[in-house]
Structure formats: C-alpha cells, structure tokens
Amino acid sequence: MKLAFLAGYRGQNFAGSQYQPHKRTVEGEFVAGGIELGLFSDAKEAHFRTAGRTDKGVSARRQLFSITTEKPELAIEALNFHLPDDIWCIGAAEVDEEFYPRYAARERSYRYYFPYPADVSRMQDAASRLIGTHNFSGFAKMEAGRDPVRTVTRAEVFEGKDGCPVFEVAAKSFLWNMVRGMAGALQTIGLGLCEPDVIEELLSSPTARVHPAPAEGLVFWDVVCDLSFTPMRQKREVKRSLAKEAAAARADMHTAEALLEDDPEEFWKKKVIRGYSALMK
C-alpha cells in the first residue's frame, strides 16, 4: 500500500532532501526511521518520493512525501517517534499505487526570508512582474532538456515580524534555484541597486543570469493537492528543538555582530553589490 505524508524538516541540518551516499539527507533519515519501525526492509522497498527536491540548507514547512508499506496503520500511529527531531510528519493519507507526489501537487509555494531591512514597496513592485507565464531561465540553474517556461500564479513581498522583507511565490512547478534567483534579484531592487523593471529584462533576455540568494533563507512553504490527511501524533521534542535552535541562532547572531565590531548590514550589502554588479544601472 502507498501512503502520502505532509511533512516538515529543518533544512540547515541536511545536505539536501534527496539521498546522497555518506551524507545526511531528509530521504535517508526518513527511510531509516521507516526501517527501524518495520515499515519496509530497505530503501528500494520504501519507494520514497517527494513533490520537489530541496537543496542543502533549504527547509520545508509542508512538503509532500510518499512511501510504500504493508503497515499503513503503524506508520500513521508511530512513524514520528522513529524520526529525528528535525523531521516531522503532520498528516498521512492512503493513496493508490499510481500516486506520485511530483504530479499530484497542483501548486507549490515557497517563502524567502531576507536577513536585513529593504524597501518592501520596491520589492513588491518587482515581484508583481514575475506573475504569469514566462521563460525563467535567467533566474534558474538550467538542466539539459528542461523547459524553462513556468507559470507563476502568485508573487508578493511583505514585511516580516522583525521588519525584514519576506517573499512568497507560488506556481505549479519551479526550475532548479528559480526561487533563490528571484529572491536575489528582489533584494538587489530592495536595496536600490537597480530598478524594478530589471525583472522584465531578466525575463526577456536569453542570456541574462542572476546570482541566487543563499539557501538558508528559503522554505518550501506549502503544497496543494487533492488529498485529505489524517493528523499524526507529534513528538513534543520537535517544537522544543525548534525553539531551542531559534534561541541559539538569535544569540549566535548577536554574538557574531558584537565580534565583528562593524555594521553587519553593510557587509551584507557589499556582498549583494558584488554578486549583482551586472544588474546595476
């Protein structure tokens, strides 16, 4: 029997979502937990699949996975307690054997969290120009044979809790590094280094390329599919671990800034300037 899961994970702790030999990955830990629980005997038997791969450092809030197991009730009841604290399942649904997360997802959305304040209104102006069907090769790392045309259904920038911009974008599918490329262009615009209409230039030029923003700010935010999920029991340790990490990261940020003895925002801006000099007017 095949099961689909809504799941989340803390990307900073993994080399990526897909299995890589001798590296800690989301797939590797998920399959290891299933083997420990007795859901299947090995990775081949598990048939682990996702709605979209994520790179090293990229987190997920609601990602779509699937596995094959003859013990669906056991998986729903106990799998979370055999996973590490930085991976968790929110809900599960029984699906037919032809189900494939990649094709079942009608829409995927991402959020990118920027580290410092920028002009949100300029960024929103630029983000709105991404909506529609375009050739997004200028924002992506292209793979041979991949169609560069995608349809973005939603793109907006708003101010987060800390006053820093947050970029949210949705589409049926994305190219590799496409969202990070968009985020990179938007932060350049938000800092006033180029105008919002540079987006049209990137969409219309077959040779233009933008440097992607760092992976650590990116979250696979949500997936829309025609499934009804049964909620799964959660480990208290997951939220406790995330809260502990958040506190440690905040303290580490303040410590690093104190040791720097200069304005870290200025260093960040200089890095953006170096990476996006080709876009400046």
UniProtKB/Swiss-Prot annotation:
Any one GO biological process: tRNA pseudouridine synthesis
**Single annotated GO MF:** tRNA pseudouridine(38-40) synthase activity
Leading EC class: isomerase
Q: Please tell me whether the keyword tRNA processing is annotated for this protein.
A: yes
Chain residues that bind substrate: 110
- Alphabetical list of InterPro entries matching this protein: PsdUridine_synth_cat_dom_sf (IPR020103), PsdUridine_synth_TruA (IPR001406), PsdUridine_synth_TruA_a/b_dom (IPR020097), PsdUridine_synth_TruA_C (IPR020095), TruA/RsuA/RluB/E/F_N (IPR020094)
Protein family (similarity comment): Belongs to the tRNA pseudouridine synthase TruA family.
HAMAP family for the chain: TruA
Q: What's the name of the protein?
A: tRNA pseudouridine synthase A
